[in-house]
A protein has these predicted regions:
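Transmembrane alpha-helices and adjacent helix-loop boundaries
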Residues: 1-220
Length: 220
């Protein structure tokens, strides 16, 4: 017999795990996109050293496991005198990881804008800033929005990795509950359902945002 009711007393811990998972996901996405924007600009820069450095960063991060990157930040940095809490180390590692993927997504968006479109904007008397905002930025965001939405969901699922360093997100909470109740099936089934609700909820939210911002605006 399954005993899901026995997990009710841990609802507070589960809620805290959900909140930390969401917090890590949102802050990581913001920081990662900021890093990614800088790297994407470097990748498309006419200055070769910048392009080389940016490419090395992207290739190094995208071709090594997130868990290894996390361990370098949490266990490696203390050896040079930099000691971080589990949550801070998780945020830094996830942001660095997201930065590499975000850079490639943003670069693809910028490169999807043809030079003729920019030239047309300038010929209409738009300033460089207005051209970037109206001719480059909005179409680029529209082109990469689905990829960014999917990347957010992937980052949210990837937060489960940070339980390996003791960050008390959702998966770590599940391990704690399992160790107290020995109800492994019930615990991980509940956590699986929690992740499913979160991911489907955010996918629906992103789809609604896309419709209101891009589809509805164009129809007007």
């Amino acid at each position: 017999n399954f005993r899901f009711g026995a997990l009710w007393r841990f609802r507070g811990q589960i809620l805290e795990g959900v909140l930390l998972t969401l917090q890590l996901s949102v802050v990581t996405m913001i920081c990662g996109l900021a890093i990614g924007l800088v790297v994407a600009m470097a990748r498309t820069s006419p200055i070769q050293p910048l392009r080389v450095i940016a490419r090395i960063y992207v290739e190094a991060i995208r071709n090594t496991p997130l868990l290894v990157q996390l361990f370098i930040v949490f266990f490696g940095l203390p050896s040079i005198g930099i000691k971080l809490s589990a949550n801070t180390a998780a945020l830094i590692a996830l942001s660095i990881n997201m930065g590499a993927y975000g850079a490639e997504i943003l670069r693809a968006g910028f490169e999807s804008i043809r030079t003729s479109q920019v030239e047309a904007g300038r010929s209409l008397g738009l300033t460089a800033g207005q051209t970037f905002r109206h001719v480059v930025l909005f179409p680029a965001i529209k082109a990469i929005y689905p990829a960014l939405a999917s990347q957010f969901v992937l980052i949210m699922l990837a937060t489960s990795v940070v339980s390996s360093i003791g960050a008390t997100e959702l998966f770590n909470t599940a391990a704690f509950i399992d160790s107290r109740t020995y109800l492994s099936f019930e615990t991980y089934a509940l956590i699986t359902a929690s992740y499913l609700v979160l991911t489907l909820g955010f996918r629906a939210l992103f789809a609604a945002i896309y419709w209101f911002v891009f589809v509805r605006r164009v129809r007007r």
